[in-house]
Amino acid sequence: MSRKKSLVEMADLHGUACKLPQGDLEDLLKGVELPEEGGRVEVGVGDDAAVIRVDGGYVIQSVDFFTPIHPDPYTQGRIAANNSINDVFAMGATEVLSVLVVSGFPRELPEEDAREMLQGFADQCREVDALIVGGHTIMNPWPILGGCVTGFAERYVTVGGAEPGDVLYLTKPLGTQPAMAALRLPEDVRKQFLTDSELEEAVDLAVEVMTEPLKDAAEAALEVGVHAMTDVTGFGLKGHAGEMAEASGVRVVIERLPVIPGTTELSRALGYGLERGESAETAGGLLVAVPEEHAEDLEDAFERRDVWYRRIGRVEEGSGVEVRGDVEEVEDYP
């Protein structure tokens, strides 16, 4: 009798690493004539979510789905929901109005596993008072799960407002991709890098990262009045910092790379580029640019909400991204 495949064995790419690479996406869109933006659209293609002006504020809309990164169906459902919803928080939404579920399941996936994925998704939505109002489900060779999320904001923050002199904060450690990849390695290979207890710690921390909503972090940023913010996901810290640099017309310098313990050596062996800020993240932290004179206010706002953070860099005149920081294996998350 054949062994039942786990969720992660049903896909070749996992979590936000299944996203089309950043450069490939940019090349693809160059050949597409999109309808002109206008009317009520304040922010369109190129940010974490679209922003549409309505009476009394702004509707924030995003869609996000991906393949499994965790073998447990319920946990995977929670991660998928959190990753979908975080995009609207990263634009300043203070309320999630609705979620439409996007799902695809292989024929060989047991119905109970699919149901557990959906239950995890629903429970994570409940944690941030997000109502599921519908969805669409297809048969698909790889399992996929995510959602189209609609939020509301009285004001919004884009990725493109960073200014020279700003300092940068990150609200979660990096390293989800190598941490979860360790689960898929043959035991004899994995033990070259991590003991059983180290693996358990790394995976547990990665799950904490991937299921922690950005709601409190975003509320703190809005309270202080930050210049720019974005969530760190499939393009990695360097890629999303690059989006901030390009959209803002500035240079971003990364001086510190806080990571989940044990993931740096794994990343070097597997070629993920975590030590260069290039490793894909799934449902990662909020990257925030704030004027240096308001940095202490932001730290205070984070601490009052029990939001973990690190000051990781600064914004200069110029262009592009420079990663010159040392890796820090964090011991205080969450």
Curated annotation (Swiss-Prot):
InterPro entries linked: PurM-like_C_dom, PurM-like_C_sf, PurM-like_N, PurM-like_N_sf, SelD_I, SPS/SelD
Active site annotation, chain numbering: 16
Positions bound to ATP: 19, 45-47, 64, 87, 135-137
Superkingdom assignment: Archaea
Protein's name according to its UniProt entry: Selenide, water dikinase
Reactions that this protein is recorded to catalyse: hydrogenselenide + ATP + H2O = selenophosphate + AMP + phosphate + 2 H(+)
GO CC terms in record: cytoplasm
Gene (name only): selD
Gene Ontology MF terms: ATP binding; magnesium ion binding; selenide, water dikinase activity
GO biological process, one term: selenocysteine biosynthetic process
EC number(s) recorded for this UniProt protein: 2.7.9.3
UniProt site (Important for catalytic activity): 19
Function statement: Synthesizes selenophosphate from selenide and ATP.
Positions contributing to Mg(2+) binding: 48, 87, 231
UniProt-listed Pfam families: AIRS, AIRS_C
Cofactor or coenzyme needed: Mg(2+)
Species annotation: Methanopyrus kandleri (strain AV19 / DSM 6324 / JCM 9639 / NBRC 100938)
Subunit record text: Homodimer.
